[in-house]
Amino acid sequence: MSRQHPTRTVAAVALAASALLASCSTQKDDDAGGGVVIESPPGVARPPYRFSARDEALLEEVQRGAFNWMWATSDPAKGVETGMCPDRTSKPTVSIAGVGFQLSGLCVGVERGWITREQGRGRAELILRSLAANPENRKAGLFYHFIDPVTAGQPADAYERVVSTIDSALLFAGVITASSYFGGDVARLGDALFRDADWRFFVAPRDAEDPQIRRFVTLGWKPEDAEAPTGKGSLLPYGWVDSGDEHRLVTFLGVCAPRETHRLDAAVYYRLRRQLGGYPGAERMVWFPWSGALFAAFFANCWIDYAGMGPDNPSAFTDLPRARVDWWENSRRTMLLHRAKAVENPLGLPGFGENGWGLSASDVEGGYAVPGLFPDALPMQALIPGSIPVRDYTEWDAKDDWGDGTIAPYAAGCCVMFDPAAAVAALRHMRGLRPGGDRSLWSDPASGGFGFQDAYNERTGWVAPDCVAIDQGPLLLAIENARTGLIWRTFHAHRFVRGGMERLGMQRTNRR
């Protein structure tokens, strides 16, 4: 349940908002779109970074642990006939989102010398052949959220049976990366799968019951009969209408579609709402009102090289009033907000502080939770004339949700792409924790261990028994991008991505 921030009064929020409105040190007004430009202040370093030998050693073992888990749990010799890693340690069912991270992670494993190129290529090819061979795992080219690890078809124990646009997007980001890296049959299989993805099929019609989602990509599709997964069904009544990382990744890949009949218009990406908020020390930012979980600031950044771009230009694609945003900088500010609020720690939760932060989707002692933190909403009509509710922003009053005080190491760790010093300090701190007294949060990768468990709670002493694919995966990729930029380079080298970038008017101007 969301909770009111106990240390903030209405007057304090108003004062903070006034200060943020007056601040223009790192953002400037721009006539295009009637909006605001969010960009980095001078002197902010961008990845890849140079790390000390000590920090490199820590990052290497964190990555190795995450890779060990994905490699060991997907071993065909142990009965995983499709070669796909499970959703979590204790559950063999596959999340296709996790497979997207896994496919990209194979590239890291080869580059780091943990597996041979032939091993990586073989595992990637097995995964893609398995996906392609079972038509009951997809509809209109996009995939069901959960699939069986042996048949790649419908699993018996999935908690939902929906074709998911975001989980398919995460899968396809990995497919494209592996295709670009390995070439050959991996590219042939992967490119064919992405070519078949019909993103337009999942767009809400102009007469959709909820006017907010009209002409935006929906969250997915559900069959009328679970026994007929490719038969009749209906789109989910929810849409990707805001500008979190998931929203942008789905829409970006839709614009990258090689078949014009399947492709989204670039304007869909720029019509996504860009609601403005702010917080002292983090300044203005675009925020997602429905989730303050930190993963919503870095999932797309695992593949899309926003660090190599500057502010975008929505006015070239839409007449709607939209701020111009450097999305890497926006994510950096979101990370600063999370860390600042952890230091403030208004509820006095044990474990939170300058090195204890990272509220995000993760396992908790009672199951699974998605806590999150939010900036203060700023007056959109004052900042961007012409803005109107619903179309351009929501009037939802989002409240900070600290959950039960559980912290997920991957959340702070992935922010190494935005603030390497803060992220490395947090990882080093968490590596040495023993929240349960006799149980460590860490298992040594040098001995085949998996690094961090999924989450921990210092108030109760609980440590998650599982590792989770969609948490281990981004940690592996984010660190690699911070160190070398490998995933960004490989993803952007693919011709489908180059085509999408051109349609979106994007350029990696910070890359040589």
Predicted segments, located by residue:
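Ser/Thr/Asn(+Pro)-rich, low-complexity disordered segments
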Residues: 35-512
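C-terminal motif of bacterial Sec signal peptides marking the signal peptidase cleavage site
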Residues: 21-23
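Bacterial N-terminal signal peptides that target proteins for export
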Residues: 1-13
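Bacterial signal peptide processing site
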Residues: 25-28
